Amino acid sequence: MYRSHTCGELRVEHAGQEVLLAGWVHRRRDHGPLIFIDLRDRYGLTQVVFDSAAAPTAHAVATDARIEYVLQVRGRVVQRPEEAYNPDLATGMIEVHATEATILNPAKNPPLYINKEGGEDETIRLKYRYLDLRRERMQRNIILRHRIVKFIRDFLDREGFVEIETPILIKSTPEGARDYLVPSRLHPGKFYALPQSPQQLKQLLMVAGFDRYFQIARCFRDEDQRADRQPEFTQLDMEMSFVDQDDVLDIIERLFTALCREITPHKRLLTPFPRLTFAEAMERFGSDKPDLRYGLELVNLGETVATSSFGVLRAALDNGGQVKGLRVPGAGHYSRKQIDEVVDLARQAGAKGLLWAIVPEMGGEVRSSFGKQVSPDEMTAIIRRMEGAPGDLLLIVADTPKIVAQTLDRLRREFGARLNLADPNTLAWAWVLDFPLVEWNDEEQRWDAVHHPFTAPKDEDLHLMDSDPGKVRAKAYDLILNGYEAGGGSIRIHQRDVQQRLFDLLGIDRETAMRQFGHMLEAFEYGAPPHGGIAPGIDRICMILADEVTIREVMAFPKTQQAVDLMTNAPSPVDERQLRELHIALRLD
């Protein structure tokens, strides 16, 4: 036996007992005759005292021990003097007086600090991830993730869901991103794909009669690693039969309300989850995933400036664009240099420029970038419409709806952070509903599915699919948490004729549809029930609940933003023999 107790287990009631501990040397303090070692495992720390007079052999071992050595210690639990209590440790009222000690394995000097945050470059942390994972913060995050997944499994089991594993080697079909392809040795020239999601398989499980399915699913997407993405990720994949949209939203809301109250009881949970339509979210926030922990809502100035003498404003409206503003409370003290930096942010977001005005104190003069282009009455009307108060900074964008939305969304998030408006201890879940079914792809001159090609259109919009597809709303819904998309889902098409109509709209001809999705179309002819589902992202939800800023901090072995595993050096070349077995020849041009 290597240990009788863990390093986080011993308390005052164990005083007088002989115990056996094993762990890593976390800290070592050498006071000559006395050596103090904090012994660590994932459960905590225990202070071990090595006395040269009482146990010279054990003291000699402690003399040789260094940081991160693996150590086994036998000793007696002793209550510390009251003045020596350490309130920061669960074991802080006791210490172990060593009688025997063994170095189970020495350790080289680690390239990063284990016993504190070292601020080293992330590449070092990822290269030596097995050391990084020894840190208290990382172990706390991984254990939090375990608790979240276990809670989900237990909750859904009580709700009558069945966990079913779907294949990892599947057929390659277009789902938005590029597939990771796996060559078949037994079938030369043919390939499997790693699933971007189990979407089609879970729908087929509904046809099979498993009316409540879930899976903690690994998914793979070979896409450019923009922002905080990973080539492989984990989602809670769910599907239900004989449900409408409200049924899906209800069970997810109950799941995550219960989960947050159990896992993060210290956080303020806003319930019930607000429901916004896609159009409302874009109008009020310029985003389909708004952070609802703070206001800073956008203001539509279309009517206010409809007859403006300022050509920039009028031209935007005449060309089908928008004029919207953002009121930033208390930012009127900004210097011209600071305002120029904000203008640069707007340009980075796609705007040609940014209009600004500072609301003066009573009787003062408005400072602005466009005061000479509008009349005093028009400026007053703009300030009144934006509910500007003295000392506020008003920001205005006039452009296409897309540019206006993405620019003001960028500025809203920027000032939400600068003004500390988002309470880190608040969880603001929300639903965004009624997304467009399709969107026009200017580059390829065709309609694309906004979510995926199996999303059902709203019944009342079916008649528009041929005449005005852009106005067709989908039975789709996104789950939002603190400004992040935490998951997406929809009610699915379950009738072959409707599915074929959508394929036709997307430019997928009948032959291609049968080749790529024939298994789905045929299944719909064998009594497919109405069904719908959702797939919340485990990595993202864990990140937010752990108060981290990147999903890499809640994954055991993540890859870099360039999809490289620095620890194992994957991807890596393979030898010619393996390629020949797979009938593959490389062409690197």
Curated annotation (Swiss-Prot):
Site entry: Important for tRNA non-discrimination: 31
TM spans (from-to): none
One example of a Gene Ontology biological process annotation: aspartyl-tRNA aminoacylation
Reaction(s) this enzyme catalyzes, per UniProt: tRNA(Asx) + L-aspartate + ATP = L-aspartyl-tRNA(Asx) + AMP + diphosphate
Residues at which ATP binds: 221-223, 230, 485, 537-540
One Pfam family matching this protein: tRNA-synt_2
UniProt subcellular location: Cytoplasm
Protein EC: 6.1.1.23
InterPro entries associated with the record: Aa-tRNA-synt_II (IPR004364), aa-tRNA-synth_II (IPR006195), aa-tRNA-synth_II/BPL/LPL (IPR045864), Asp-tRNA-ligase_1 (IPR004524), Asp-tRNA-ligase_1_N (IPR047089), Asp/Asn-tRNA-synth_IIb (IPR002312), AspRS_core (IPR047090), GAD-like_sf (IPR004115)
Aspartate: annotated segments: 199-202
Binding site for L-aspartate: 175, 221, 451, 492
An example Gene Ontology molecular-function term: nucleic acid binding
PROSITE patterns, alphabetized: AA_TRNA_LIGASE_II
Listed GO CC annotations: cytoplasm
The entry's keywords: Aminoacyl-tRNA synthetase, ATP-binding, Cytoplasm, Ligase, Nucleotide-binding, Protein biosynthesis
Keyword flag DNA repair: no
Highest taxon of the lineage: Bacteria
PANTHER family the UniProt entry points to: ASPARTATE--TRNA LIGASE, MITOCHONDRIAL, ASPARTYL/LYSYL-TRNA SYNTHETASE
NCBIfam families the UniProt entry points to: aspS_bact (TIGR00459), PRK00476.1 (NF001750)
Quaternary structure and partners: Homodimer.
Its biological purpose: Aspartyl-tRNA synthetase with relaxed tRNA specificity since it is able to aspartylate not only its cognate tRNA(Asp) but also tRNA(Asn). Reaction proceeds in two steps: L-aspartate is first activated by ATP to form Asp-AMP and then transferred to the acceptor end of tRNA(Asp/Asn).
Family: Belongs to the class-II aminoacyl-tRNA synthetase family. Type 1 subfamily.
Name under which the protein is recorded: Aspartate--tRNA(Asp/Asn) ligase
Lineage, broadest ranks: Bacteria, Bacillati, Chloroflexota, Chloroflexia, Chloroflexales
Gene giving rise to this polypeptide: aspS
